[in-house]
Amino acid sequence: MKPYRYDIVGSFLRPDYLKDARAEYAEGTLSADQLREVEDKAIKELVEKEKAVGLKAVTDGELRRRYWHLDFLASLVGVEEIKADHWSVAFKGHQPKAATLEIVDKIDFDENSEFLDHFSYLKEIAGDVDCKMTIPSPAMLHLICCVRGSETYKAIDRYKNEDDLYHEIALAYQKAIKAFYARGCRYLQFDDTSWGEFCDQNKRDDYASRGLDLDQIAKNYVKMINEALEAKPEDMTITMHICRGNFRSTWFSSGGYEPVAETLFGGCKIDGFFLEYDSDRSGDFKPLRFIKDQKVVLGLVTSKDPELEDKTEIKERIKEAAQYVALDQLCLSPQCGFSSTEEGNILTDEDQWKKMTLIKEIAEEVWG
Protein backbone atom coordinates (compact mmCIF):
# COMPACT_ATOMS: atom_id res chain seq x y z
CA MET A 1 0.00 0.00 0.00
CA LYS A 2 1.48 3.34 -1.07
CA PRO A 3 2.98 5.45 0.39
CA TYR A 4 5.24 2.86 1.96
CA ARG A 5 6.15 2.54 5.66
CA TYR A 6 9.60 3.89 4.85
CA ASP A 7 9.59 6.14 1.82
CA ILE A 8 11.43 9.02 0.17
CA VAL A 9 10.48 12.50 -0.92
CA GLY A 10 12.37 12.11 -4.18
CA SER A 11 15.60 13.99 -4.83
CA PHE A 12 19.12 12.73 -4.17
CA LEU A 13 22.55 14.37 -4.31
CA ARG A 14 24.03 14.72 -7.80
CA PRO A 15 27.39 12.96 -8.25
CA ASP A 16 30.27 15.31 -9.10
CA TYR A 17 30.71 13.83 -12.58
CA LEU A 18 27.10 14.75 -13.39
CA LYS A 19 27.60 18.32 -12.14
CA ASP A 20 30.74 18.54 -14.29
CA ALA A 21 28.85 17.26 -17.34
CA ARG A 22 26.08 19.79 -16.81
CA ALA A 23 28.65 22.59 -16.60
CA GLU A 24 30.25 21.38 -19.84
CA TYR A 25 26.82 21.27 -21.49
CA ALA A 26 26.15 24.86 -20.36
CA GLU A 27 29.50 25.91 -21.87
CA GLY A 28 28.65 24.18 -25.15
CA THR A 29 31.44 21.57 -24.94
CA LEU A 30 29.05 18.65 -24.35
CA SER A 31 26.07 17.79 -26.57
CA ALA A 32 22.54 17.13 -25.29
CA ASP A 33 22.91 13.45 -26.25
CA GLN A 34 26.19 13.17 -24.36
CA LEU A 35 24.65 14.82 -21.30
CA ARG A 36 21.73 12.39 -21.45
CA GLU A 37 24.16 9.47 -21.46
CA VAL A 38 25.81 10.80 -18.31
CA GLU A 39 22.40 11.35 -16.69
CA ASP A 40 21.34 7.81 -17.62
CA LYS A 41 24.49 6.40 -15.99
CA ALA A 42 23.97 8.44 -12.81
CA ILE A 43 20.32 7.41 -12.55
CA LYS A 44 21.16 3.74 -13.08
CA GLU A 45 23.74 3.91 -10.28
CA LEU A 46 21.27 5.74 -8.02
CA VAL A 47 18.49 3.20 -8.56
CA GLU A 48 20.85 0.38 -7.60
CA LYS A 49 21.65 2.21 -4.35
CA GLU A 50 17.95 2.82 -3.67
CA LYS A 51 17.21 -0.87 -4.16
CA ALA A 52 20.22 -1.87 -2.04
CA VAL A 53 18.92 0.19 0.90
CA GLY A 54 15.58 -1.62 0.60
CA LEU A 55 13.30 1.07 -0.80
CA LYS A 56 9.94 -0.22 -2.04
CA ALA A 57 9.67 2.66 -4.52
CA VAL A 58 12.55 4.35 -6.31
CA THR A 59 12.87 7.71 -8.05
CA ASP A 60 15.36 9.03 -10.59
CA GLY A 61 16.55 11.39 -7.87
CA GLU A 62 15.46 14.33 -10.07
CA LEU A 63 19.00 14.06 -11.43
CA ARG A 64 18.02 15.51 -14.83
CA ARG A 65 16.63 18.70 -13.27
CA ARG A 66 18.14 21.99 -12.18
CA TYR A 67 15.25 22.77 -9.86
CA TRP A 68 12.60 20.53 -8.33
CA HIS A 69 9.84 22.65 -9.86
CA LEU A 70 10.82 25.17 -12.55
CA ASP A 71 11.98 22.59 -15.11
CA PHE A 72 8.58 20.89 -15.17
CA LEU A 73 6.46 24.04 -14.92
CA ALA A 74 8.40 25.73 -17.73
CA SER A 75 7.77 22.64 -19.88
CA LEU A 76 4.02 23.29 -19.79
CA VAL A 77 2.56 24.84 -22.92
CA GLY A 78 1.87 28.54 -22.33
CA VAL A 79 4.51 28.95 -19.59
CA GLU A 80 7.99 30.44 -19.99
CA GLU A 81 10.95 30.58 -17.61
CA ILE A 82 12.45 34.05 -17.39
CA LYS A 83 15.48 35.51 -15.64
CA ALA A 84 14.81 37.48 -12.48
CA ASP A 85 16.71 40.02 -10.40
CA HIS A 86 16.24 37.93 -7.27
CA TRP A 87 14.58 34.69 -6.14
CA SER A 88 10.85 34.94 -5.39
CA VAL A 89 11.41 34.00 -1.73
CA ALA A 90 14.35 34.72 0.57
CA PHE A 91 16.17 31.70 2.00
CA LYS A 92 17.90 31.94 5.38
CA GLY A 93 21.45 31.91 4.04
CA HIS A 94 22.39 30.72 0.53
CA GLN A 95 20.27 32.04 -2.36
CA PRO A 96 19.51 30.06 -5.55
CA LYS A 97 20.15 31.36 -9.07
CA ALA A 98 17.29 33.76 -9.75
CA ALA A 99 14.59 32.66 -12.20
CA THR A 100 10.82 32.83 -12.35
CA LEU A 101 7.88 31.95 -14.60
CA GLU A 102 5.51 33.85 -16.84
CA ILE A 103 2.15 32.73 -18.21
CA VAL A 104 2.12 33.79 -21.87
CA ASP A 105 -0.65 31.68 -23.45
CA LYS A 106 -3.21 28.93 -22.82
CA ILE A 107 -1.77 26.50 -20.26
CA ASP A 108 -1.62 22.87 -21.33
CA PHE A 109 0.43 19.72 -20.79
CA ASP A 110 2.67 18.78 -23.70
CA GLU A 111 1.89 15.16 -24.61
CA ASN A 112 5.47 14.85 -25.88
CA SER A 113 6.90 16.15 -22.59
CA GLU A 114 10.45 14.98 -21.87
CA PHE A 115 9.27 14.23 -18.33
CA LEU A 116 7.30 11.28 -19.70
CA ASP A 117 10.51 9.94 -21.22
CA HIS A 118 12.29 10.51 -17.90
CA PHE A 119 9.74 8.27 -16.20
CA SER A 120 9.90 5.63 -18.94
CA TYR A 121 13.66 5.35 -18.50
CA LEU A 122 13.27 4.95 -14.74
CA LYS A 123 10.66 2.23 -15.20
CA GLU A 124 12.84 0.46 -17.75
CA ILE A 125 15.83 0.16 -15.40
CA ALA A 126 14.01 -0.31 -12.07
CA GLY A 127 13.10 -3.96 -12.56
CA ASP A 128 10.44 -5.29 -10.21
CA VAL A 129 10.51 -2.37 -7.75
CA ASP A 130 7.85 0.38 -7.78
CA CYS A 131 8.69 3.70 -9.48
CA LYS A 132 7.66 7.08 -8.11
CA MET A 133 7.49 10.24 -10.22
CA THR A 134 7.68 13.66 -8.58
CA ILE A 135 6.33 16.84 -10.15
CA PRO A 136 5.47 20.26 -8.69
CA SER A 137 1.90 20.65 -7.49
CA PRO A 138 -0.69 22.49 -9.61
CA ALA A 139 -0.63 25.19 -6.92
CA MET A 140 2.99 26.08 -7.65
CA LEU A 141 2.34 27.77 -11.00
CA HIS A 142 -0.25 30.10 -9.48
CA LEU A 143 1.88 30.65 -6.36
CA ILE A 144 4.95 31.72 -8.33
CA CYS A 145 3.18 33.90 -10.90
CA CYS A 146 0.18 35.31 -9.04
CA VAL A 147 1.03 35.26 -5.32
CA ARG A 148 4.79 35.71 -4.98
CA GLY A 149 4.73 37.75 -8.19
CA SER A 150 1.48 39.57 -7.38
CA GLU A 151 3.01 43.04 -7.61
CA THR A 152 4.14 42.53 -11.23
CA TYR A 153 1.69 39.87 -12.49
CA LYS A 154 -0.43 40.94 -15.45
CA ALA A 155 -3.07 38.41 -16.49
CA ILE A 156 -3.27 37.65 -20.20
CA ASP A 157 -6.73 38.21 -21.72
CA ARG A 158 -7.58 34.51 -21.47
CA TYR A 159 -7.09 34.58 -17.69
CA LYS A 160 -8.62 37.93 -16.74
CA ASN A 161 -11.10 35.78 -14.82
CA GLU A 162 -8.87 33.93 -12.37
CA ASP A 163 -11.29 31.00 -12.17
CA ASP A 164 -10.38 30.22 -15.79
CA LEU A 165 -6.70 30.09 -14.82
CA TYR A 166 -7.33 27.65 -11.97
CA HIS A 167 -9.52 25.50 -14.22
CA GLU A 168 -7.02 25.26 -17.07
CA ILE A 169 -4.12 24.47 -14.72
CA ALA A 170 -6.27 21.62 -13.37
CA LEU A 171 -7.03 20.41 -16.91
CA ALA A 172 -3.32 20.46 -17.81
CA TYR A 173 -2.58 18.33 -14.75
CA GLN A 174 -5.40 15.94 -15.64
CA LYS A 175 -3.63 15.37 -18.95
CA ALA A 176 -0.31 14.90 -17.15
CA ILE A 177 -1.80 12.33 -14.76
CA LYS A 178 -3.29 10.36 -17.66
CA ALA A 179 -0.05 10.56 -19.66
CA PHE A 180 2.14 9.32 -16.79
CA TYR A 181 -0.39 6.57 -16.11
CA ALA A 182 -0.21 5.48 -19.75
CA ARG A 183 3.58 5.15 -19.35
CA GLY A 184 3.05 2.79 -16.41
CA CYS A 185 3.25 5.27 -13.52
CA ARG A 186 1.20 4.17 -10.51
CA TYR A 187 2.83 6.43 -7.90
CA LEU A 188 2.90 10.19 -8.52
CA GLN A 189 3.77 12.97 -6.10
CA PHE A 190 2.91 16.67 -6.12
CA ASP A 191 5.61 18.77 -4.41
CA ASP A 192 4.24 21.98 -2.92
CA THR A 193 5.78 24.87 -0.97
CA SER A 194 2.63 27.02 -0.98
CA TRP A 195 1.29 25.44 2.21
CA GLY A 196 4.59 25.97 4.00
CA GLU A 197 4.39 29.65 3.10
CA PHE A 198 0.74 29.88 4.14
CA CYS A 199 1.76 28.53 7.60
CA ASP A 200 4.29 31.33 8.11
CA GLN A 201 2.82 34.30 10.01
CA ASN A 202 5.36 36.78 8.62
CA LYS A 203 4.50 35.73 5.08
CA ARG A 204 0.78 35.85 5.85
CA ASP A 205 1.19 39.43 7.08
CA ASP A 206 3.23 40.39 4.01
CA TYR A 207 0.73 38.90 1.56
CA ALA A 208 -2.19 40.49 3.45
CA SER A 209 -0.48 43.89 3.09
CA ARG A 210 -0.53 43.30 -0.68
CA GLY A 211 -4.28 42.65 -0.55
CA LEU A 212 -4.05 38.87 -0.90
CA ASP A 213 -6.48 36.65 1.02
CA LEU A 214 -4.43 33.51 1.69
CA ASP A 215 -7.34 31.64 3.26
CA GLN A 216 -9.37 32.04 0.06
CA ILE A 217 -6.36 31.19 -2.12
CA ALA A 218 -5.83 28.03 -0.04
CA LYS A 219 -9.44 27.00 -0.70
CA ASN A 220 -8.96 27.72 -4.41
CA TYR A 221 -5.82 25.55 -4.44
CA VAL A 222 -7.59 22.60 -2.82
CA LYS A 223 -10.43 22.93 -5.33
CA MET A 224 -7.93 23.06 -8.24
CA ILE A 225 -5.93 20.08 -6.96
CA ASN A 226 -9.11 18.07 -6.43
CA GLU A 227 -10.20 18.88 -9.99
CA ALA A 228 -6.83 17.64 -11.27
CA LEU A 229 -7.26 14.46 -9.21
CA GLU A 230 -10.52 13.66 -11.00
CA ALA A 231 -8.32 12.10 -13.71
CA LYS A 232 -6.64 9.71 -11.26
CA PRO A 233 -7.36 6.05 -12.02
CA GLU A 234 -8.32 3.75 -9.11
CA ASP A 235 -5.01 1.90 -9.10
CA MET A 236 -2.84 5.04 -9.03
CA THR A 237 -1.59 6.68 -5.82
CA ILE A 238 -1.00 10.44 -5.77
CA THR A 239 0.63 12.02 -2.73
CA MET A 240 1.69 15.54 -1.80
CA HIS A 241 4.91 16.71 -0.16
CA ILE A 242 4.66 19.97 1.76
CA CYS A 243 7.91 21.88 2.09
CA ARG A 244 9.19 25.02 3.81
CA GLY A 245 12.16 25.43 1.48
CA ASN A 246 15.19 23.20 0.95
CA PHE A 247 18.16 24.82 -0.78
CA ARG A 248 21.75 24.12 0.35
CA SER A 249 20.35 22.98 3.73
CA THR A 250 18.48 26.28 4.26
CA TRP A 251 14.76 27.17 4.37
CA PHE A 252 12.38 30.08 3.77
CA SER A 253 9.19 29.36 5.77
CA SER A 254 8.46 28.63 9.40
CA GLY A 255 5.31 27.76 11.32
CA GLY A 256 3.03 24.87 12.25
CA TYR A 257 0.30 23.49 9.96
CA GLU A 258 -2.66 24.91 11.92
CA PRO A 259 -3.45 27.84 9.54
CA VAL A 260 -4.01 25.44 6.61
CA ALA A 261 -4.87 22.17 8.35
CA GLU A 262 -8.66 22.19 8.11
CA THR A 263 -8.70 23.37 4.48
CA LEU A 264 -5.87 21.13 3.28
CA PHE A 265 -6.04 17.98 5.41
CA GLY A 266 -9.82 18.10 5.69
CA GLY A 267 -10.53 18.96 2.06
CA CYS A 268 -7.81 17.71 -0.29
CA LYS A 269 -8.54 14.34 -1.91
CA ILE A 270 -4.90 13.34 -2.11
CA ASP A 271 -3.92 9.79 -1.04
CA GLY A 272 -1.18 10.82 1.37
CA PHE A 273 0.76 13.76 2.76
CA PHE A 274 4.54 13.87 3.18
CA LEU A 275 4.91 16.36 6.04
CA GLU A 276 8.05 18.04 7.33
CA TYR A 277 8.48 17.46 11.05
CA ASP A 278 12.25 17.57 11.54
CA SER A 279 12.39 20.75 13.64
CA ASP A 280 10.24 23.00 15.81
CA ARG A 281 9.69 25.18 12.72
CA SER A 282 7.01 22.66 11.72
CA GLY A 283 5.01 22.95 14.95
CA ASP A 284 3.27 20.12 16.80
CA PHE A 285 1.10 17.23 15.61
CA LYS A 286 -2.28 18.72 16.65
CA PRO A 287 -3.18 19.86 13.11
CA LEU A 288 -3.21 16.17 12.10
CA ARG A 289 -6.62 15.90 13.79
CA PHE A 290 -8.10 17.07 10.47
CA ILE A 291 -6.64 14.12 8.55
CA LYS A 292 -9.32 11.77 7.25
CA ASP A 293 -8.30 8.50 5.61
CA GLN A 294 -5.10 9.80 3.98
CA LYS A 295 -1.73 8.31 4.85
CA VAL A 296 0.65 10.68 6.66
CA VAL A 297 4.36 10.26 6.01
CA LEU A 298 6.20 11.89 8.89
CA GLY A 299 9.36 13.69 7.77
CA LEU A 300 11.07 13.29 11.13
CA VAL A 301 14.58 12.67 9.80
CA THR A 302 16.20 15.80 8.41
CA SER A 303 17.79 15.85 4.97
CA LYS A 304 19.50 19.15 5.79
CA ASP A 305 22.44 17.93 7.88
CA PRO A 306 24.44 14.71 8.32
CA GLU A 307 23.92 14.11 12.04
CA LEU A 308 21.92 10.92 12.59
CA GLU A 309 18.78 11.21 14.67
CA ASP A 310 18.26 9.21 17.87
CA LYS A 311 16.04 6.19 17.19
CA THR A 312 14.26 6.39 20.54
CA GLU A 313 13.38 10.06 20.02
CA ILE A 314 11.98 9.37 16.54
CA LYS A 315 9.87 6.50 17.89
CA GLU A 316 8.54 8.76 20.65
CA ARG A 317 7.54 11.37 18.07
CA ILE A 318 5.74 8.71 16.02
CA LYS A 319 3.82 7.81 19.20
CA GLU A 320 2.93 11.48 19.68
CA ALA A 321 1.61 11.72 16.12
CA ALA A 322 -0.42 8.55 16.68
CA GLN A 323 -2.52 10.45 19.23
CA TYR A 324 -4.08 12.27 16.26
CA VAL A 325 -3.78 9.79 13.37
CA ALA A 326 -4.00 6.00 13.67
CA LEU A 327 -0.54 4.38 13.74
CA ASP A 328 -1.56 2.28 10.74
CA GLN A 329 -1.99 5.48 8.67
CA LEU A 330 1.51 6.72 9.53
CA CYS A 331 4.78 6.20 7.64
CA LEU A 332 8.32 7.59 7.90
CA SER A 333 10.58 9.47 5.47
CA PRO A 334 13.22 12.21 5.35
CA GLN A 335 11.80 15.70 5.88
CA CYS A 336 12.54 16.61 2.25
CA GLY A 337 14.70 15.53 -0.64
CA PHE A 338 18.49 15.64 -0.33
CA SER A 339 18.90 17.87 -3.38
CA SER A 340 15.86 19.97 -4.28
CA THR A 341 18.11 21.86 -6.68
CA GLU A 342 21.17 20.62 -8.53
CA GLU A 343 23.47 22.16 -5.91
CA GLY A 344 22.31 19.78 -3.16
CA ASN A 345 22.22 19.97 0.63
CA ILE A 346 25.35 20.13 2.76
CA LEU A 347 25.99 16.45 3.44
CA THR A 348 27.72 13.60 1.61
CA ASP A 349 26.47 10.72 -0.50
CA GLU A 350 27.36 8.37 2.35
CA ASP A 351 25.38 10.56 4.77
CA GLN A 352 22.18 10.39 2.72
CA TRP A 353 22.28 6.58 2.63
CA LYS A 354 22.93 6.39 6.37
CA LYS A 355 19.77 8.48 6.81
CA MET A 356 17.79 6.12 4.58
CA THR A 357 19.10 3.06 6.45
CA LEU A 358 18.07 4.65 9.76
CA ILE A 359 14.57 5.35 8.43
CA LYS A 360 14.15 1.76 7.27
CA GLU A 361 15.37 0.35 10.60
CA ILE A 362 13.02 2.56 12.62
CA ALA A 363 10.05 1.75 10.37
CA GLU A 364 10.66 -1.99 10.68
CA GLU A 365 10.95 -1.71 14.47
CA VAL A 366 7.73 0.34 14.75
CA TRP A 367 5.51 -1.38 12.19
CA GLY A 368 7.23 -4.74 11.77
Regions found by a protein language model. Name each.
Residues 1-368:
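Domain-level signal for soluble alpha/beta catalytic cores
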